[in-house]
Amino acid sequence: MAAYPAVSAPYGLKPINLIGGQVFAGSTRNFPIQYNYGTAIYYGDAVTLTAGYATIPTYPVNSTNVVVGVFLGCYYTNPTTKQRLYSQYYPGSVLAGDITAIVCDDPDTLFQVAATTSAGGTTIGSVSSLLVGSNIVGGTQTGSATTGNSSMSVVSASAAGATTAGFRIIQLIPDTQISTSCTYVSGGAPSATSVVVSGLAVNTYLPVGTDVYNLVNGQLQYTGATLSSASTVTTTGNTTLTVTSIATQVAGTVVLVQTPEATVKFNFGVHRYNIA
């Protein structure tokens, strides 16, 4: 079953709430951007401070490449028109001395973010249920001059990221999940790392992080497994899926659930305000 709305591309980090039920006012802080700073900054990019100026941090965001928040636009005096210009993104190399970045800098902010299959790619991936409460690596910080939006993401994985990884997964976002039904054929025993299914349409793409469920009496039962290798169905008939260690026997009707988006926050030690 396809999701609506569909997630077609990464869009950066979108602030949605604060952790712990705190009141979220959507407040921001202004930081200067250096005259003629040469790197573009897009709406939804993580930013850091360099000598007091907002800049793009070194990739990947982690406990070494720390951040001060997420860029939500800027304003400056247009050097040609001499009028104040408000912009979704900073294009880079602007000859103005009053460039001001608008930054969501609260370290308790929760962000909605899409997963991609690679750090610099735009192909949408999946965040596994196995990783909730664990760490995940962030993608590279690029964006679109057409929309002004970032294409930063988190990177699909079948195992938790290192303790230095930039983000902690707080929860999955069910609204945009994609469910694909198929039929169990063989394998799929507890501790196994593969299962054979049938009934998948040709060209169906299943990214790493796609979770494997049994459909039992109309209810989803998690098998404790997720795809550890991406799979594209090339022929009708049987498809072998490579998965993490299975906890519950796969059987009957199988539902493969992709989760393109998750709620995350910056890990402790990644945000500059949480560093001693």
Q: Which residue stretches match the model-derived regions?
A:
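Surface-exposed, low-hydrophobicity beta-strand/loop segments enriched in small/polar/acidic residues
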Residues: 1-186, 190, 198, 207, ...
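Signature of Asx- and small-polar-rich beta-strand/turn repeats characteristic
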Residues: 237-243
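Active-site-adjacent substructure of cysteine-protease-like catalytic cores
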Residues: 203
